[in-house]
A protein has these predicted regions:
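Loop/turn elements at helix/coil->beta-strand transitions in domains of secreted/extracellular proteins
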Residues: 19-24, 55-60, 127-132, 152-155, ...
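Formylglycine-dependent
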Residues: 89-130, 137-200, 204-216, 222-225, ...
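Long, internal low-complexity/basic segments
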Residues: 19-21, 28, 32-33, 58, ...
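C-terminal cap/loop subdomain of S1 sulfatases and analogous C-terminal strand-loop tails that border
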Residues: 268-284, 300-301, 307-387, 418-422, ...
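A short beta-strand-to-alpha-helix junction
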Residues: 41-46, 61-68, 107-118, 172-182, ...
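Beta-strand elements within well-structured catalytic alpha/beta cores of enzymes
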Residues: 21-32, 51-52, 76-78, 124, ...
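Histidine-centered active-site microenvironments of extracellular/periplasmic hydrolases
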Residues: 44, 144-153, 211-213, 248-300, ...
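Short, structured active-site-proximal loop/turn typified by the sulfatase FGly-forming signature C/S-X-P-X-R
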Residues: 41-74, 79-84, 130-132, 155-157, ...
Length: 452
């Protein structure tokens, strides 16, 4: 199956040429929708991201394809919804189906990206692209095999562990800062492939907690009145500096005008940082889904698009921009929005999270226009929101708009059926109420009372 799909790519691909654009895809970890200054943050300085925003297209309503890291990474690399590839969450003992603190038997999640998946890197290689990932893969373990980066189309894979960093650590034994070292390695690689088209995937660990910020930046924000969290602010600015280093290298090598630079995050931020949105990472409320997103590159009309976009849309978008044949995928190309940011993108979009993680339980959601419906599998209840009037999702209109709620639920169920999405409705026989952690009322589909 995979060989057949790759042969189809080869049949439609010509030889690489100097005119083929490069791609630099920078992915933040847990960066909330309003952490960068270009998204409205008044406390954190992100001059390099702000420059990208001025020179490119910003997607002001961008959402992750999933509320946590692994599935979103699978979606952006394959252009598919989670039920297609089966990656729903990070697989570890805390979230294993049948855990005593789960009311329902959660769906099984793949630990690795299916070997038959065709990734963005695999699609680009027949066009003569050099491909590399420097950072977190999170879609399978090991360095060789069909589900590793090398098995999924990347010529080079450098993870923090290879550079002397423990898992999720910002610093090594010498005190070196992981994002800086990864950026050093990535830019050295760019120097070696500068004379051919390349795809650089740079998934940073920042801004995932717990933070270990640079002292001078931490001191800067501690001395700035009103900064909500100096450690987060310092970590965001440190990441922005590395973005600046990438941009400076592209300019030094004369590659700015032939390179698309994408920046986004894998999911929404933690709930204390996403106000006025509700929820956070691990939930299907807007706080868990909204992410910063932008692209700069040749032929784009700078501006702001208000269309609802998903992580999986980057796959067909970047293939179209590089003239690469695109297989049938769930994502939609955003190229029309890059030519005219005021253009519309009409479609229903879906999310499916049949697992437990942190504060979030199994649920599924649909957005159709301004309306969003969430189905919570615990208790079998739904919530309905008009995001145009209530972006914070405080007023559940399911009872006031029963017809609309029923129509959206029918669409959601039809989509679940068409994609083979698992519906975790079976009670967990091992459930122990005393073992249940305090997950918060809103993540069980029991949100706060509507304001008077």
């Amino acid at each position: 199956m995979k060989l057949t799909r790759l042969l189809l790519f080869l049949a439609g691909c010509g030889l690489a040429s100097a005119a083929q654009p490069n791609i630099v895809f920078i992915l933040a970890d847990d960066m909330g929708w309003n952490d960068p200054a270009f998204a409205g943050n008044c406390f954190i300085e992100t001059p390099h991201l702000d420059r990208l925003a001025r020179e490119g297209v910003v997607f002001s309503a961008a959402c992750a394809s999933a509320p946590n890291c692994a599935p979103t990474r699978a979606c952006l690399l394959t252009g598919q919804y989670p039920p297609r590839h089966g990656v729903y969450t990070v697989v570890d003992d805390r979230h294993a189906p049948g855990s005593p603190h789960h009311r329902l038997l959660a769906a099984e999640s793949r630990e690795a990206l299916p070997a038959e998946s065709v990734t963005l890197a695999e699609a680009l290689r027949p066009k003569g692209y050099a491909t590399a990932i420097f950072g977190m893969w999170n879609l399978g373990r090991g360095r060789t095999g069909p589900s590793t980066p090398v098995g999924q189309g990347f010529d080079v894979f450098v993870e923090p562990k290879q550079l002397g960093f423990e898992k999720d650590a910002y610093r090594d034994a010498r005190g070196a800062y992981s994002p800086d070292v990864l950026t050093d390695a990535a830019l050295k690689w760019v120097d070696t492939v500068k004379d051919r088209p390349f795809f650089l995937y740079l998934p940073f660990h920042d801004v995932h907690a717990p933070f270990d910020p640079k002292p001078e930046l931490l001191e800067k924000y501690r001395g700035r009145p009103g900064t909500p969290d100096p450690a987060l602010a310092a970590t965001v600015e440190a990441m922005d500096r590395n973005v600046g280093r990438v941009l400076a290298t592209l300019e030094r090598l004369g590659l700015k005008e032939k390179t698309y630079v994408v920046f986004t995050s894998d999911n929404g931020g933690t709930r204390q940082y996403v106000a006025p949105l509700r929820g956070g990472k691990g939930t299907l409320y807007q706080g868990g889904l909204r992410v910063p997103a932008l692209i700069r590159g040749p032929g784009l009309r700078p501006g702001v698009s208000n269309a609802t976009t998903l992580s999986m849309d980057w796959f067909p978008t970047l293939l179209e921009l590089t003239g690469t044949p695109t297989p049938e995928v769930d994502g939609r190309s955003l190229v029309p929005l890059l030519r005219d940011p005021a253009a519309t993108l009409r479609r229903d979009v879906f999310w499916h999270f049949p697992c437990y993680i942190g504060g979030g339980g199994p649920c599924s959601a649909i957005r159709s226009g301004d309306w969003k419906l969430i189905e919570f599998f615990e208790g079998g209840r739904t919530e309905l929101y008009d995001l145009s009037a209530d972006p914070g999702e405080l007023r559940d209109l399911a009872s006031a708009e029963p017809k609309r709620a029923a129509e959206l639920l029918a669409k959601l169920r039809a989509w679940q059926t068409s994609t083979g999405a698992p519906r975790p409705v079976e009670p967990n026989p091992a459930y122990d109420p005393k073992a249940e952690p305090n997950r918060g009322r809103e993540n069980r589909g029991k949100g706060p009372k509507n304001p008077k």
